[in-house]
From Swiss-Prot:
Species of the source: Panchlora viridis
Domain of life: Eukaryota
GO CC entries: extracellular region
InterPro entries: Pyrokinin_CS
GO terms of biological process kind: neuropeptide signaling pathway
Location (main, coarse): secreted
Protein name as it appears in the record: Pyrokinin-5
Secretion signal span: none
Protein's job: Myoactive.
A GO term for molecular function: neuropeptide hormone activity
Assigned keywords, A-Z: Amidation, Neuropeptide, Secreted
Keyword rRNA processing among UniProt keywords: no
PROSITE patterns: PYROKININ (PS00539)
Amino acid sequence: GGETGSDAKAMWFGPRL
């Protein structure tokens, strides 16, 4: 996963595109 994202999950899930 990436550190870029609006959601908190995006931190470990990756950028939500």
